[in-house]
């Protein structure tokens, strides 16, 4: 037996030891713990606003911290900032590349970012002295498409890419400060922890990873999915996160327990998940699907509590407002819908 085989064997035995330790510590399940909880009943939401203006598939959206404005990115080559109360377009920004896959709103409300098949993250300043929106910085450096980006603040942004890495960038200098390496497939999504000290990523290697932003290292890896992970989102308290995958399941992972707590699936659901978001309390998990619907899951009981049906094509993105009062869905049908 050569050295490589013996190392493989050693790695397997270590993995099994970790599995056994997890099992030993797992004295209850989420479903058992949730038996005494009152069921939440049927969740019925209505479309309160329809945002019309994009001329092609919408690929991404992100709410601003004011819970009023949101940014969306479409294949029509436009980034639109909307006022969701009035449905007015605050800004319509023409992009240099129409192959956009992600967009993000800075916490301050002063900047938006986007990127895609141009392999870079473009930052736009919404609050210039002249009143026009312009590119304030382009961040090239990834060797593959940009799948997701999220601002830490006005000068730092985290990106994920098809080059199997994530990156932390200094916007002022335009340089990548940290590269987060470890995934063995395209990284499709990321979610920042509420305290912004860590983030979680989901990738085509069917695993999710938790990263320490300051140390630049992977702290934990969460296997379990059987296909690409397309979406991740932190639980509101930062102690857990949910994933959505092409294997037609969403899953809840607990960081402290270092394992999967629940799986959200249904025999009738056979298509992939594109996007996930929690309600403000975390009791509801909203997930967008390839079958044009958005399913609402009871996080604790792992049961479906409702369906948001209204789009005529794939639901590609969704987001819950900071104040928890509304959810927006974006679709390949070119419309955004705001529900509550």
UniProtKB/Swiss-Prot annotation:
SUPFAM superfamilies: WD40 repeat-like. Keywords: Phosphoprotein, Repeat, Transducer, WD repeat. It holds the Pfam family WD40_Gbeta. One of its GO terms (cellular component) is heterotrimeric G-protein complex. The modification Phosphoserine is found at residue 29. Guanine nucleotide-binding proteins (G proteins) are involved as a modulator or transducer in various transmembrane signaling systems. The beta and gamma chains are required for the GTPase activity, for replacement of GDP by GTP, and for G protein-effector interaction. This is Guanine nucleotide-binding protein subunit beta-1. It comes from Drosophila melanogaster (Fruit fly). The lineage of its organism: Eukaryota, Metazoa, Ecdysozoa, Arthropoda, Hexapoda.
């Amino acid at each position: 037996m050569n050295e490589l085989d013996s190392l493989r064997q050693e790695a397997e035995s270590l993995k099994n030891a970790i599995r056994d330790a997890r099992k030993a510590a797992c004295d209850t399940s989420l479903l058992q713990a949730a038996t005494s909880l009152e069921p939440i009943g049927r969740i019925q939401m209505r479309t309160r606003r329809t945002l019309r203006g994009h001329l092609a598939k919408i690929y991404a959206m992100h709410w601003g911290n004011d819970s009023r404005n949101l940014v969306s990115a479409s294949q029509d080559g436009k980034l639109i900032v909307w006022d969701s109360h009035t449905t007015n377009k605050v800004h319509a920004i023409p992009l240099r590349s129409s192959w956009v896959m992600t967009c993000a709103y800075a916490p301050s409300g002063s900047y938006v970012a986007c990127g895609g098949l141009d392999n870079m993250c473009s930052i736009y300043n919404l609050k210039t002295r002249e009143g026009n929106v312009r590119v304030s910085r382009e961040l090239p450096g990834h060797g593959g498409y940009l799948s997701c980006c999220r601002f830490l603040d006005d000068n730092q942004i985290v990106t994920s890419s098809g080059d199997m890495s994530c990156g932390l960038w200094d916007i002022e200098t335009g340089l990548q400060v940290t590269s987060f390496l470890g995934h063995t497939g395209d990284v499709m999504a990321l979610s920042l922890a509420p305290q912004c000290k860590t983030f979680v990523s989901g990738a085509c290697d069917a695993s999710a990873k938790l990263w320490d932003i300051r140390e630049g290292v992977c702290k934990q890896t969460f296997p379990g999915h059987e296909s690409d992970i397309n979406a991740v989102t932190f639980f509101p308290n930062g102690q857990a996160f949910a994933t959505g995958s092409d294997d037609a399941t969403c899953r809840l992972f607990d960081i402290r327990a270092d394992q999967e707590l629940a799986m959200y699936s249904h025999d009738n659901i056979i298509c992939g998940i594109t996007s996930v978001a929690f309600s403000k309390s975390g009791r509801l998990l909203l997930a967008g699907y390839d079958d044009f619907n958005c399913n609402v899951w009871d996080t604790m009981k792992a049961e479906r509590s409702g369906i948001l049906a209204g789009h005529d094509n794939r639901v590609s993105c969704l987001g819950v407002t900071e104040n928890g009062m509304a959810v927006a869905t974006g679709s390949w049908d070119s419309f955004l819908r705001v529900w509550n």
